[in-house]
Amino acid sequence: MKILRKNHPLLKIINHSFIDLPTPSNISSWWNFGSLLGVCLMIQILTGLFLAMHYTSDTTTAFSSVAHICRDVNYGWLIRYLHANGASMFFICLFIHVGRGIYYGSYVLSETWNIGIILFLTTMATAFVGYVLPWGQMSFWGATVITNLLSAIPYIGNTLVEWIWGGFSVDKATLTRFFAFHFILPFIITAFALVHLLFLHETGSNNPSGLNSDSDKIPFHPYYTIKDLLGIFLLLLALMILALFFPDVLGDPDNFTPANPLNTPAHIKPEWYFLFAYAILRSIPNKLGGVLALILSILILAAFPLLNTSKQHGLIFRPVTQAIYWTFIANLLVLTWIGGQPVEYPFTTIGQXASITYFTIIIILMPVSNIIENNIIKL
């Protein structure tokens, strides 16, 4: 068996990726989230496949088909809630994974980092089109508001919006194509995830100390397979608690009402994992400016390798940048809270301040703290 896994063309790839992979001996549980994202993706594809067998992407029957899945299909309610809450677990793991990458300086592996940003954007697109499919009130109005933002693009904006809608409003054509996108995108994510892994294994993993660990590597199996299995069991436990005890806690009550183009909900808002970006969008009074800020809130992650001037890898021995980093995390939580609040004083003012802080920390404070710490080292 040992000879086979080392020589067989297919098994050799698996062996070099998950069994004999040289791994730093000191990576902590923060490195578990990559494998947890892989598990989340598999759960989403499997549950999504079973949901797609019973779902109909037609405006007259979409809402009823989701109700039918929950009421009449064997364990349909469980599959539906695992899929809906699985998306939330996916984004929790994704945010922690990106946060760990920033904290420990993983962005210096630029190819892996940039493919990670593409994965992040693709996952957000998948979640957005998926949220439209149940065809509830918030699904319909969320789709209308977010797709309508494209009309801010000069010259081609209105044409682009109508092209995406497949008509002059969000209707049957929109739902059908969103279902098609939602079905195909997870497989594109899987392909990108493999490329992400390929580039990671070209350079090897980073580690908490930020030091070169070539002299102290251990095989991935059994040490980290066991560690990953523990993480997977904890993830599944959290997902089952969420899906069985609090299935609707992260959803929106408006989505229990079928979509009605003649009745606008009091507060249109996306799912919780988009609220930070939505708050940044809303904090700018100009439509085009808001859209640009929304896009930049994610794409600014690509600036981390460019803005990094530190002589040290990661933040483990850098107290000044650590303080700024945790301020950044707190600011993100404030943005998430503001995104779910109505557009009125004082929430708009808090949102504007938090949005300015978000970009200031990344573009100004972190690079300045790098320079300060580099000078402290020389003392």
UniProtKB/Swiss-Prot annotation:
- MF GO annotations: metal ion binding; ubiquinol-cytochrome-c reductase activity
Q: Which residues bind heme b b566?
A: 97, 196
Q: Which cofactor does it need?
A: heme b
Summarize where heme b b562 binds, as residue positions: 83, 182
Its membrane topology: Multi-pass membrane protein
Where can this protein be found? Mitochondrion inner membrane
The residue ranges crossing the membrane are 33-53, 77-98, 113-133, 178-198, 226-246, 288-308, 320-340, 347-367
Gene3D superfamilies according to UniProt = Cytochrome Bc1 Complex, Chain C
In this chain, a ubiquinone is annotated as bound at 201
Main location per UniProt? mitochondrion
Q: Does the keyword Iron apply?
A: yes
Could you list this entry's UniProt keywords, alphabetically sorted.
Answer: Electron transport, Heme, Iron, Membrane, Metal-binding, Mitochondrion, Mitochondrion inner membrane, Respiratory chain, Transmembrane, Transmembrane helix, Transport, Ubiquinone
Q: How is the cofactor bound?
A: Binds 2 heme b groups non-covalently.
- How does the record describe its quaternary structure? The cytochrome bc1 complex contains 11 subunits: 3 respiratory subunits (MT-CYB, CYC1 and UQCRFS1), 2 core proteins (UQCRC1 and UQCRC2) and 6 low-molecular weight proteins (UQCRH/QCR6, UQCRB/QCR7, UQCRQ/QCR8, UQCR10/QCR9, UQCR11/QCR10 and a cleavage product of UQCRFS1). This cytochrome bc1 complex then forms a dimer.
Q: Which family does it belong to?
A: Belongs to the cytochrome b family.
- Which function does this protein serve? Component of the ubiquinol-cytochrome c reductase complex (complex III or cytochrome b-c1 complex) that is part of the mitochondrial respiratory chain. The b-c1 complex mediates electron transfer from ubiquinol to cytochrome c. Contributes to the generation of a proton gradient across the mitochondrial membrane that is then used for ATP synthesis.
Q: What is this protein called?
A: Cytochrome b
In its UniProt entry, the species of origin is given as Akodon orophilus
